[in-house]
Amino acid sequence: MCDGGLPGFISDPQEYTINPKENSVYDVIFYTGFTYRIKLCTKNTPAKLEFNLVDEKGNTQFTKNIEAGFFRDFEFDTLFHGKIIIKPLDSSIKEAQLLIGYKKKKKEN
């Protein structure tokens, strides 16, 4: 479903299948010193979804209405405990998947 995967990143082996009929919520922990790539894919494109990254206190750190194929890189200065919340905005979505990958952050000179 996610053609090309996450080149250059180590893929999280857990499968994150998105429920196309309701919100999907995933607990995540992100560590300092890494770059994380999050990618959303659907079988039918373009499909619209809302992506939210929320910290453990419920504060929204990032939100965006997106289309399938979206990816974004994140880096964290401190240990991040939170949730990824995916809201389907398109009733035509049949199958959707979330990929999370990581790689060691390059050291700055």
Model-derived features with residue positions:
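Transition segment at domain starts
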Residues: 1-22
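Acidic, Ser/Thr/Pro-rich low-complexity intrinsically disordered segments
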Residues: 16-97, 104-109
